[in-house]
Amino acid sequence: MVLSDNIWYLWSEAVDNASYDSLDLLEDSTTEEILDTVGDGMDQMAPKLGEVFRYMRDNHLYDIQAGEDSVERTDGSYTVGLPSYRDAFIFINRDNTFRDYQSLIHEFGHFCSYYYNTVPEMYQGFHVDVCELQSQGLEMLSTRYAGSLFGEGDSAYTYETMSDMLYVAITACMIQEFEEAVYTTPDMTLDDMNRRFKEIQDSYDGWYYRVYGNMCYDWVDIPHLFYSPMYYIGYGTSALSALDLWVLSGEDWDGAVDIYLGILNEGLEAPYRGTMDRWGMKDVFDEADIKELSLELGRIAGTGSMEAEEAGNSAQPDGEAPGVSANETSAAQDNRSVQFIILAGIGTVIVLQVLIISVGLVILWEVRKKR
């Protein structure tokens, strides 16, 4: 999904209609073709990942198909643990687009985490930030092989994967702000919730959910809000770390893969900030780190691809920024727009994380009063 005209402009010269047309051809892919393609990508990325993928496939630990008219299937995709077998199982309800490939890569990241986990089920917990990085990080790393996997669709696939992460980083902050507004106002009516969600979305420039008059009620389609309160923000923090890993992969591919494999071996309950620090990654709650990440992403977006960025680094003389075009001033302005989008979202993350403590105290106080 396109986040803004600025981001689309930065990538428009590299992503043309022909690339999207090539991705559209994947609509006719069979499940076996999807498994073959993603399996090849895992083999190219790291032999260990290829080995785990073959284990998953040989033991039929997946259900990947589209629902037929007479068969009802759960929407979306997920991975569940099978603790009695010390295994996991991937479920994907296909929508017959290139997203089926993305879904398998994402869920395979979760599968790998279960594969390497050694803590018995009854003793284990999990940190959503790390768990989602194990899947989102694999999505971002897979873009390196988009050319061999998707042919002419490589630039469109890379753009869609990167913009998905930016989208999640921003909307996760928006959802968190909405949750806190609801929990700190126990008497809020449904209409008030719908109006409040629209107000919050408007403060984020209103790009994300459909508006109906002065209300926006598509938040009801987010199941996490009902069964796992305050969970969704973890998708945003992990998305930023996935983007950080992607930037690192352009500087040191082998090092980035080693970091990813190391994070997989951290297990399901590794603490987020401690894990990021241990592997030398940016702290998404540190303003300086986020500013640096936004600059790096803006520079890469300005060149149109990670490959162009790498080529630019080797071709530019010392002191000259890579990827600068003849329209240098306009590109710089667009880079600042990208930075603003990311910084605005992260600023909200920092504030909201502090407010979570207050929300908990309010809830505890209400419970005590009822008793």
Regions found by a protein language model. Give the residues of each.
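C-terminal, non-catalytic "cap/extension" segments appended to globular domains
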Residues: 6, 10-14, 104, 148, ...
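Glycine- and acidic
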Residues: 17-26, 50, 85-97, 114-128, ...
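Conserved helix-loop functional segments at active or binding sites
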Residues: 44-51, 80, 110, 114-120, ...
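Active-site recognition of the HExxH zinc-binding catalytic motif
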Residues: 95-115, 135, 140, 238
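Short, aromatic-rich amphipathic segments at membrane interfaces
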Residues: 310-345
